[in-house]
Structures are given as C-alpha cells and as structure tokens.
Amino acid sequence: IMSISSLTHLVTHDKINIDSRWSKLKKLKRLLIIIIVTAFLYFYYNEETTNLLKKIFPDSYSTDVTEVGEDKGSYIIINNNEPDFNDEDKTTDSFEKYSKLDFLGRAGVAYANISKELMPTTERESIGMIKPTGWHTIKYDIVPGKYLYNRCHLIGYQLTGENRNELNLITCTRQMNTVGMLQWESMVSNYIKETNNNVLYRVTPKYEGNNLLASGVQIEAYSIQDNGKGVKFNIFVKNIQDGIEIDYKTGDSKLIENNN
C-alpha cells in the first residue's frame, strides 16, 4: 500500500507537470496572438494604421499630393511659385538633411542650403546597385535611351555631390529626370557658380497613400543673399512618361495602345 508521503509526492509531481504544460500553452497562445496581429497589420493595414504610422514617423513620411496650381506640362506651379522656407534657415550656413526611409522603404524630404563648397569636384560613380521602391528594369522603344526608369537624385548630384545615398534616391521616369527635374537643378547650379551665393533647396517626394512610386516631386528653391531675386520657385514635377501607363502602387507599366 502506498504511503501517504508517497501519494503526496506523486500528486505534487503531477501538479507541477500540469502547471508546466499550462504555462507553455499560455506562452504559445500569446505567441500565436502576436503573430496573427502582426500579420494582419502587415498585410491589411488600413487608413487608420497609415495615419498612426504618419504620427510615429512625421519627419520621414512623405505626404500625399494636395496642392495644385498652374499646369505647365511637365510641371505644375504651386502657391504662385512662392516657396515656404523658415526664416531661421535663410542663412549662409550650408547644410544637407535627408529623411529616414519610411515604413515602406520610401525616401522622404531632402533639404539643403547649397553653396559652392557643397558642389562636387569629381565625376559621379555608378549607382546601379541601389534599387529604390517601385524599381523595375524595363525598356520601351518610345522612351529615349529605352529604359523607362532612372534612379533620380532628389537633390541633384551637381548641387551637393551626394550620390550613392538611398535616402536621396527615388524611382522616376526618364522624362521626369531629364525633362522635368534637370532644368531646375541646372538653374540653381548655374546661379551659384555665377554669384557664389547660397540657395535653399528642398525636394519632397509625393506618394498617394501606400504607393511605392512617387506621383512626382515638389521642388522649392530660394536664393539667400538677394532675397529670392536670383532664384525663387515652388513647383511640382510629374513622374510620367508620354505613351506609357504606370501603376504607381507597384511601379508596373505598359505601353498605351494607339487608338488612331
């Protein structure tokens, strides 16, 4: 006959085993809940989740396109061409600031006080290893140079010499790069070289919702020493390519069929 002490020991041992198993089950349950919630947020995040992420990453989340003005074809004039810079930044102290990539890996605002000292003195190196969000390597015969997409520097290399920096690169069309942005970058570059003055320069990629490809970029510029008389503009450059239909959510594209 089992003694009372042996019986007590057996009951205690069984209780410990049950408690241990129950503890493991509770941990497993908590882990499953975490996995389910995380998966839900990752695959099905809605507008409320996006708004929350905007609050968490206010300095790096690129805003939607909300302002429109006079349409000039490759670009749109914003706010009567008046940029919106803080007075405290209107100094002759050069700087560069780049936003962190947001929760989708997209580049955000790039901001600089550009002077001759920031400009490059060497040739630009290859940036082919960098693939910004929405990137696809695809060719069309109707696109000059064939390739639809370029790696666009938000602040052009000729202005600050910033090259292999993923915080300063987005996926843009050939048309946006060479027709849309280049003329404004060259205007600023030529002005600085001729006057040795400073120019405040800010480029803001505009994404609609959770699109991986920017709809375009807002570019603002203001020359410091002459209070904007030399350079002053506020424009939106469209990320488009004539004859090509683009899915800005993914970066996919297709040739527009000729209806004629």
Task: Go through each PLM region and give its residues.
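Domain-level detector of nuclease and nuclease-like folds
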Residues: 87-260
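N-terminal, intrinsically disordered, polar/charged segments of Gram-positive cell-envelope systems
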Residues: 47-95
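Positively charged n-region of N-terminal signal peptides that target proteins for export
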Residues: 25-29
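Hydrophobic membrane-insertion alpha-helices, especially the h-region
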Residues: 31-45
